[in-house]
Swiss-Prot record:
GO MF assignments: beta-galactosidase activity; carbohydrate binding; magnesium ion binding
Family: Belongs to the glycosyl hydrolase 2 family.
Protein name per UniProt: Beta-galactosidase
GO cellular component, as recorded: beta-galactosidase complex
Organism, as annotated: Enterobacter cloacae
Organism lineage string: Bacteria, Pseudomonadati, Pseudomonadota, Gammaproteobacteria, Enterobacterales
Summary of subunit composition and partner proteins: Homotetramer.
Length: 1028
């Protein structure tokens, strides 16, 4: 839609374009590849700045209104008296205006498409700027808005220029006729809601404003309007043809010539020129303004995420005198994407997608993404074995794709379409009135991004059901770009609108037979009749808070079933926003913290990294199963380890394998071997072991691959994609020498045992160890008690929408059974003096409303060394849900500086999330033992521990543990991490059993059966001593 006469503000408002799904723009220029109009070839070749691009980022003037009708007519030509400075790009909600709203599924406005509320927050921006006088003499001056949420009208010097919507793709307008010498004034009226908001119901914060770059671009009268590159490889991949289609514009294009030059590392590879005019395409002739060239390339360096080899293509438009009018340029990656034999392949090899979903989110800047944050995201992803990213759920900032090209990441580029809150979800997708809007969101994305080699898959959007509009857009995509597959999950991931079976949150082995959209287990799915497509999970492993359990199980399936080709973890970063409390201190806020209604509370906290991009423990776990190296013990005598490279295209030219053999964490022997493997190759290593019978303890072999030299995405000596493995070699026990006997003293109220400088006190009324003195100093702040519950995880809560409670969720079952309100009752508490030791036996029943849920029998033995030995048996009622844990809890008086342990570490790990942890002897500061999840939950566990030292306390056995300044009760009752208050001493939780955290999703019970207590009786032992 174009060439509409200039209208008054009141006339534009009366027309209400923002409530008409057929109207998506007025006067917006056609979509195209990014343009720069360089003046010389070296600048274009080197991707230097272009003098014909002028940024308008900076401080604009801004006035806020609660509805567009409140904007005065005079604002079009002059600022309002209350105008303030507003940074561009930014979201105005992050600058103190209006309220950010977080919802997952629920629309933030009443559902009545295409209409939006009368109260429609409106931001009025203005900027005074100047342009080069030469720009006014000839050529075309455009303005490019890379992202405005959600719709806007544009004026220049009081003249209405046009209108646009679609928050995530550029809106470009021709300003030439409106510009004048000296100062010029832009006015942009941005509406928070428009009919397009019904297509933008993504799981994210709903914010507004000019949140991406604003740029002026000057083009000559005769110009390159667009270009499209395609690389074609022969079967042997040793010869390629670069095909380039160019579209020219302007009155004189017919007399022009385009010179194409292909560069690699600054050196010219090939050059060819062509005049405009295509081959005849139909009975009416040819495209006069188009031209096509093909450039053969011998032995091309191929692009992949592992080897992001890039060429540079420059396209110089010359006038009849041979003078350069302008040059456009882009990176070129030679690669072939295809689906054949049921497999997604790149350059002939089946891919294994180590992917993650990524929202554009910044805790302080909202949806504004700067280059440094983009680079940090990519570098962190690659350092943790990720090779792919899904742009969930909209086209990203244009710089993102260039960085993915250059660093090496496979990209799923996704259209800005989601109608999750509609009932049914497919309501708009099956309505032809919404086809134009949906179509522009797909076609314009492709026209902007199709030259990027990193983009290997197009996506039609997310969670919008399945309708005829999807089928139409799928066919357009397959016709326009046959070089890439298309994926779309809506309608059950099994429709004709997708080349890939791409379900979300399908389980490895368990079916979810939902009506109309069943989710079969992924192993079953690829074996369904007539199903020949690859399966790649568009979302899986929901990393909400303390989650990500069972991730390794997916990777066991991916590695053993070729057509299970990986997936995209949900998701990259916790979508929390920085907020200040009443005292001016900053904290990370989630849904509802801004008074936003509706909201879905902490459901925005699903990241592998915190908002500041520091890692969650789950990131390390992702690092492990999807690593590029796997290790197999081939034989034990001699000890031979085989290393398998998962690189498809890279030789191991920067990898060394470090190995250590350690007894109880103490290194016995170590070595290093340079790896020299071809892609997908193997290498065997024989390790000469020392004599292992010389002492007690467990002996482990740890292996790890490191990269000695720095890479573009990692520093030197980093663990190569976290590639590590561990193998138990031997376990022996040590007998302790005999020393002085412990002495028992009894009264009606207490049992007291003394051994040298130590005294233990058991209270007969409670049956608990209530105090432990050393040198007369109390070391306990609470009794040692049974512990069967945990501060609920998000996965335990099992609520995907804050207004709904799932009675099948673990926490609801535990609450109903009374596990958070147990009353212990002592049945037995007696002690006996033996020759060298004292034995205390106790028996407790843990009751809820008079019903016995647990029976705990304990035998405490204090031996000649002053060591407390515990032998505990716990029996459970047959009709109660399986508990979160079985163990003990105590509040220690000491606040140690460090915690030391022998077991899995160093980071937090849980029974179903411990593959990336290493066996070793670890030391961490006490504060590092706590994981600061924004929504407080159970955290900080370390598994498979054999020795623990917390200050003077040393515990031995085989157990899991956590040490924290915060009690489980405080964690359970606190809504935000910054509200936690450190308690004196520290809390020690000692677990014989701890249920997995789950994570297949966060709204249904997802802990695998093997990580749920399978027996109704559990016995465990440990020893505890205090060291001077």
């Amino acid at each position: 839609m174009s060439d509409t006469p200039s209208l008054t503000l009141s006339a534009l408002l009366a027309r209400r374009d923002w409530e008409n799904p057929v109207v998506t723009q007025w006067n917006r220029l056609a979509a195209h590849a990014p343009l720069h109009s360089w003046r010389n070839e070296p600048s274009a070749r080197d991707d230097a700045g272009s003098a014909r691009r002028q940024t308008l980022n900076g401080l604009w003037r801004f006035s806020y209104f609660t509805a567009p009708e409140q904007v005065p007519q005079a604002w079009v030509t002059e600022d309002c008296a209350d105008a303030v400075a507003m940074p561009v790009p930014s979201n105005w909600q992050m600058q103190g205006f209006d309220t950010p709203i977080y919802t997952n599924v629920t629309y933030p406005i009443p559902v009545n498409p295409p209409f939006v509320p009368q109260e429609n927050p409106t931001g009025c921006y203005s900027l005074t700027f100047e342009v080069d006088d030469a720009w006014l003499q000839s050529g075309q001056t455009r303005i490019i808005f890379d992202g405005v949420n959600s719709a806007f009208h544009l004026w220049c010097n009081g003249q209405w220029i046009g209108y646009s919507q679609d928050s995530r793709l550029p809106a470009e307008f021709d300003l030439s006729a409106a510009l004048r010498p000296g100062q010029n004034r832009l006015a942009v009226m941005v509406l928070r809601w428009c009919d397009g908001s019904y297509l933008e119901d993504q799981d994210m914060w709903r914010m507004s404003g000019i949140f991406r770059d604003v740029t002026l671009l000057h083009k000559p009268e005769t110009q390159i309007a667009d270009y499209h590159v395609v690389t074609d490889l022969n079967a042997e991949l040793d010869r390629a043809v670069l095909k380039v289609d160019v579209t020219l514009a302007g009155a004189g294009f017919a007399d022009g010539e385009v010179v194409f030059t292909l560069w690699r590392k600054g050196e010219k590879c090939a050059s060819v020129s062509r005049q405009p005019g295509s081959a005849i395409v139909d009975e009416r002739g040819s495209w006069a303004e188009r031209l096509t060239v093909t450039i053969p390339v011998e032995t091309p360096a191929l692009w992949s995420a592992e080897t992001p080899e890039l060429y540079r293509l420059t396209m110089a438009l010359l006038n009849p005198q041979g003078e350069v009018l302008e040059i456009e340029a882009c990176d070129v990656g030679f690669r072939r994407v295809e689906i054949s034999n049921g497999l997604l392949k790149l350059n002939g090899k089946p891919l294994l997608i180590r992917g993650v979903n990524r929202h554009e989110h910044h805790s302080e800047n909202g949806q504004v993404m700067d280059e440094a944050t983009m680079r940090r995201d990519i570098e962190t992803m690659k350092q943790h074995s990720f090779n792919a990213v899904r742009c969930s759920h909209y086209p990203n900032h244009p710089l993102w794709y260039q960085l993915c090209d250059r660093y090496g990441l496979y990209v799923v580029d996704e259209a800005n379409i989601e109608t999750h809150g509609m009932v049914p979800m497919s309501r708009l997708a099956d309505d032809p009135r919404w086809l134009p809007a949906m179509s522009e969101r797909v076609t314009r994305m492709v026209q902007r991004d199709r030259n990027h080699p990193s983009i290997i898959i197009w996506s039609l959007g997310n969670e919008s059901g399945h309708g005829a509009n999807h089928d139409a857009l799928y066919r357009w995509l397959k016709t326009t770009d046959p070089t890439r597959p298309v994926q779309y999950e809506g309608g059950g991931a099994n429709t004709a609108a997708t080349d890939i079976v791409c379900p979300m949150y399908a389980r490895v082995d368990r079916d979810q037979p939902f009506p109309a959209v069943p989710k079969w287990s992924i192993k079953k799915w690829i074996g369904m009749p007539d199903e020949t497509r690859p399966l790649i999970l568009c979302e899986y492993a929901h990393a909400m808070g303390n989650s990500f359990g069972g991730f390794a199980k997916y990777w066991q399936a991916f590695r053993s079933h070729p057509r299970l080709q990986g997936g995209f973890v949900w998701d990259w970063v916790d979508q929390a926003l920085t907020k200040r409390d009443e005292d001016g201190n900053t904290f990370w806020a989630y849904g509802g913290d801004f008074g936003d209604k509706p909201n879905d509370r902490q459901f925005c906290l699903n990241g592998l990294v915190f908002p500041d991009r520091t890692p969650h423990p789950a990131l390390y776990e992702a690092h492990g199963p999807q690593q590029f190296f796997t290790f197999t013990r081939v034989s034990t005598s001699p000890l031979v380890i085989e290393v398998q490279s998962g690189y498809l295209f890279r030789h191991t030219d920067n990898e060394v394998l470090n190995w250590t053999v350690a007894r109880d964490g103490d290194v016995l022997v170590a070595g290093e071997v340079t790896l020299a493997m071809v892609p997908e190759g193997t290498q065997r290593l024989e390790i000469a072991l020392p004599e292992l019978n010389a002492g007690p303890g467990e002996v482990w072999l740890n292996v790890e691959v490191r990269q000695p030299r720095a890479t573009p995405w990692s520093p030197a000596a980093i663990a190569a994609a976290g590639s590590s493995g561990r193998f138990r070699l031997r376990s022996l026990l040590l007998r302790q020498p005999r020393r002085r006997a412990a002495v028992l003293t009894q009264t009606d109220r207490i049992l007291e045992i003394a051994h040298r400088q130590q005294r233990w006190q058991f209270d007969r009324a409670s049956g608990n160890l209530t105090q432990w003195w050393r040198n007369g100093v109390e070391t306990l702040l609470s009794p040692l008690t049974d512990n069967v519950s945990r501060a609920p995880l998000d996965n335990d809560i099992g609520v995907s929408e804050a207004t709904k409670i799932d009675p099948n969720a673990w926490v609801e079952r535990w609450k109903a059974a009374g596990m958070y309100d147990l009353t212990p009752r002592v049945l037995h508490c007696e002690a006996e003096q033996h020759a060298g030791e004292v034995v205390v036996t106790t028996q407790h029943v843990l009751e809820y409303r008079g019903k016995a849920l647990f029976l705990s029998r304990k035998v405490w033995r204090i031996d000649e060394q002053g060591v407390l030995h515990g032998d505990i048996q716990v029996d459970m009622a047959s009709d109660i849900p399986e508990p979160a844990r079985i163990g003990l809890s105590v509040h220690l008086a000491e606040t140690p500086e460090n915690v030391r342990w022998l077991g899995l570490g160093p980071h937090e790990n849980y029974p179903d999330r411990k593959l990336a942890a290493q066996q070793g002897r670890w030391t961490l500061p006490l504060e590092a033992m706590h994981t600061p999840y924004i929504f407080p939950t159970e955290n900080g566990l370390r598994c498979d521990t054999r020795e623990l030292v917390v200050g003077m306390h040393q515990l031995n056995g085989h157990f899991h543990f956590s040490v924290s300044r915060y009690s489980q009760q405080q964690l359970r009752e606190t809504t935000h991490h910054h509200l936690l208050r450190e308690e004196p001493g520290c809390w020690l939780n000692l677990d014989a059993f701890h249920m997995g955290v789950g994570g297949d999703d966060s709204w249904s019970p997802s802990v695998s059966p093997e990580f749920i207590l399978q027996t109704r009786q559990l016995r465990y032992t440990f020893s505890w001593q205090q060291n001077p």
